[in-house]
Amino acid sequence: MNSQFAGLTREACVALLASYPLSVGILAGQWIALHRYLQQLEALNQPLLHLDLMDGQFCPQFTVGPWAVGQLPQTFIKDVHLMVADQWTAAQACVKAGAHCITLQAEGDIHLHHTLSWLGQQTVPVIGGEMPVIRGISLCPATPLDVIIPILSDVEVIQLLAVNPGYGSKMRSSDLHERVAQLLCLLGDKREGKIIVIDGSLTQDQLPSLIAQGIDRVVSGSALFRDDRLVENTRSWRAMFKVAGDTTFLPSTA
C-alpha cells in the first residue's frame, strides 16, 4: 500500500497523505487479533496505522516503545505519536524502526526545532524505495495555539488533541470547534500544505461538523474496534469524509 509514496517529494507525500482521512489507532484493538486486523485493513486499502507511544512520564499511561513500530508490516504507513519525556531519543529510535510520520508533543520538548529539523533530513523505507519522514506537532487541549508559530515551516501535520493524554478527560464539542476555528485563523495563508488532525475519543456523530470546518483527518481507536466490527466501522467512518466531499479518497469495497 505504501509503494505509491516511493520517491515522492515531501510536498507530494503530504498531498497524497491528505487523501487518507482516517488513521487507525491499532493499539486499541485486542493484540491477540493483530494479524487479523492488519489483513482486514490491507484489504480495505487503509494504510495509516496510528501508534501512541507513552512512557509513563509525559502522561500516566505506558503503552509501547519504538520497537513496536518495527514489528508492523512494511506495507503500512506508520503514523507515530510520541507522548514521552525524551522526544529526541524516541524520535531517532522511531526513524530507525521505520516510522513514516512522527508527531511530537508541543509541551514535551524545549528543543522542538532541533528535533523537527533533524526529522526533516530523514528518509524511511517504503515498498519500492524511500519517502521523507513526515513531521507533526500535537497540542493538548489547554496548550495555546500560538506555540506552533515558530515551527510552522518545520511541520506538515498539526494535531489537536480532544482529550488530555493518559487521563481521558474530553473537550466539549463546542470548545473543540472553537479551537479548530482558532487554528484555521492562526494559519491563514499558511494553511496550504498542512494536514489538520483531530485525535481523541471522537464519536461518528461529531465528524460531519468537524469535516465541514475543514479538518483533514481523524485518529480513531476504540470506536473502530467496537463490537469487533473493524471493517464495518472503518468503512463507515471513511464514508463520512467521502459524503462531505472533503477528500478524493474512495473507500475500498473489499
From Swiss-Prot:
Subcellular location: Cell membrane
Family, similarity comment: Belongs to the ribulose-phosphate 3-epimerase family.
InterPro entries hit by this protein: Aldolase_TIM, Ribul_P_3_epim-like, RibuloseP-bd_barrel
Record-given protein name: Putative epimerase LsrE
Keyword annotations: Cell membrane, Isomerase, Membrane, Metal-binding, Transmembrane, Transmembrane helix
NCBIfam families reported for this sequence: PRK14057.1 (NF010658)
GO cellular component: cytosol; plasma membrane
Chief location: membrane
Keyword match Isomerase: yes
PANTHER family, alphabetized: RIBULOSE-5-PHOSPHATE-3-EPIMERASE (PTHR11749)
Membrane topology reported for the UniProt record: Single-pass membrane protein
Stretches that traverse the bilayer: 14-34
Induction (free text): In the absence of AI-2, repressed by LsrR. Induced by AI-2, via release of the LsrR repressor.
Class of enzymatic activity (EC top level): isomerase
Active site: D52 (proton acceptor), D199 (proton donor)
The EC number(s) this enzyme carries: 5.1.3.-
Pfam families: Ribul_P_3_epim
Free-text comment on the cofactor: Binds 1 divalent metal cation per subunit.
Gene Ontology terms for molecular function: D-ribulose-phosphate 3-epimerase activity; metal ion binding
Magnesium recorded as keyword: no
Binding site for substrate: H81, G166, Y167, G168, S169, D199, G200, S201, G221, S222
Cofactor(s) for this UniProt protein: a divalent metal cation
GO terms (BP aspect): carbohydrate metabolic process; pentose-phosphate shunt, non-oxidative branch
